[in-house]
């Protein structure tokens, strides 16, 4: 495999901030940081949130690394208390379309299921997001849809 997944470090700050501040790319992420941002220093805000979410057991975020460089993020979050979690993934635009998202997404889904013993991992994507639809379809089973999203599931 071409990638490594590991915890974010202070050395990732610039690349991670760029990823988090990319409004065009993040419209597909389904979350706008401005919802929770209270004016904190943006230079440290995003990594601080990652660390706080981990400490409070709300999420496990992994830096996606290519040759040691942070090129994206994959995470498990929204743990449901019944053995399930939701997964999300985003890749910096200059690395998109090369299969990195699929590789990272599959690795974390399998880690969650087979190492952490989750019973299922779910994900969703906007209907207009062809790249995410292809990524999710390659490693999960489509479970349904509504007007806005396609929903996917992976079980042990």
Where are these regions (language model features)?
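Acyl-donor (CoA/ACP) binding surface of acyl/acetyltransferases
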Residues: 1-27, 61-156
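Hydrophobic residues in alpha-helical segments
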Residues: 20, 29, 53-55
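Conserved GNAT-fold acetyl-CoA-binding loop/helix
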Residues: 26-48
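Short, conserved alpha-helical segments within structured domains
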Residues: 34-38, 60, 128
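Intrinsic structural disorder
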Residues: 37, 45, 57, 97, ...
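A short helix-loop-beta-strand connector motif used in the catalytic cores of GNAT acetyltransferases and
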Residues: 47-62, 72
């Amino acid at each position: 495999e071409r990638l490594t997944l590991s915890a974010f470090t202070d050395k990732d700050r610039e690349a991670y901030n760029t990823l988090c501040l990319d409004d065009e790319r993040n419209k597909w992420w389904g979350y706008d940081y401005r919802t929770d941002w209270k004016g904190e220093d943006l230079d440290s805000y995003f990594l601080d949130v990652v660390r706080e979410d981990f400490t409070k057991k709300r999420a496990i975020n992994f830096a996606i690394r290519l040759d040691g460089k942070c090129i994206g993020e994959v995470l498990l979050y929204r743990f449901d208390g019944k053995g399930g979690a939701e997964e999300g993934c985003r890749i910096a635009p200059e690395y998109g379309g090369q299969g990195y998202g699929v590789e990272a997404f599959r690795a974390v889904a399998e880690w969650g299921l087979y190492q952490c013993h989750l019973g299922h991992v779910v994900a969703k994507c906007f209907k207009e997001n062809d790249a995410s639809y292809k990524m999710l379809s390659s490693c999960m089973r489509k479970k349904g849809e509504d007007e806005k999203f396609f929903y996917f599931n992976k079980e042990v």
